[in-house]
A protein has these predicted regions:
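N-terminal flexible/basic segments that precede or flank functional cores
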Residues: 1-35, 99-111
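Short polybasic/polar patches that bind polyanions
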Residues: 17, 42, 53, 83
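DNA major-groove recognition helix of helix-turn-helix/homeodomain DNA-binding modules
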Residues: 76-92
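Short alpha-helical DNA-recognition segment
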Residues: 46-63
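Short basic helix-loop element that most often maps to the first helix and adjoining turn
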Residues: 33-50
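DNA major-groove recognition helix of helix-turn-helix
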Residues: 66
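Short, solvent-exposed alpha-helical "recognition" segments
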Residues: 69-74
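A general secondary-structure junction signal
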Residues: 93-97
């Protein structure tokens, strides 16, 4: 029996860039922020209804957020939601790392 050879493309580590999205960096940022928001919601054991009241948005929008359907949420709005869950958000701008071709945007969580 002959063996089949399977070719696999090596990704960049950024699924949005690999899929060719023009706004890959923004999508990655929104996903990182949503991940942190969902962690905070889970840590506080909040229901979607309770989160909707805190954020002042309809509960179905919270369902979208919990399921990472983020088209209706800007990164600024997600940052605002994080502050509504009693967290400070600090933005730090520093020189890019020498091993990167361009600057990066990332979300870091402090203890």
């Amino acid at each position: 029996m002959a063996r089949k050879t399977e070719l696999v493309d090596v990704g960049t580590g950024d699924v949005f860039k690999d899929l060719g999205f023009a706004d890959a960096d923004e999508r990655k940022l929104r996903t990182q922020l949503a991940m942190r928001l969902n962690d905070l919601i889970k840590e506080r054991k909040l229901t979607q209804t309770a989160v909707a009241v805190i954020f002042g948005i309809p509960q179905p929008h919270i369902s979208e957020l919990r399921n990472y359907k983020l088209s209706r949420f800007s990164s600024e709005r997600l940052l605002h939601f994080i502050t509504q869950l009693d967290r400070d958000v600090e933005i730090v701008i520093r020189p890019k790392a020498s091993n990167h071709a361009a600057g990066l945007v990332s979300v870091l969580v402090a203890a």
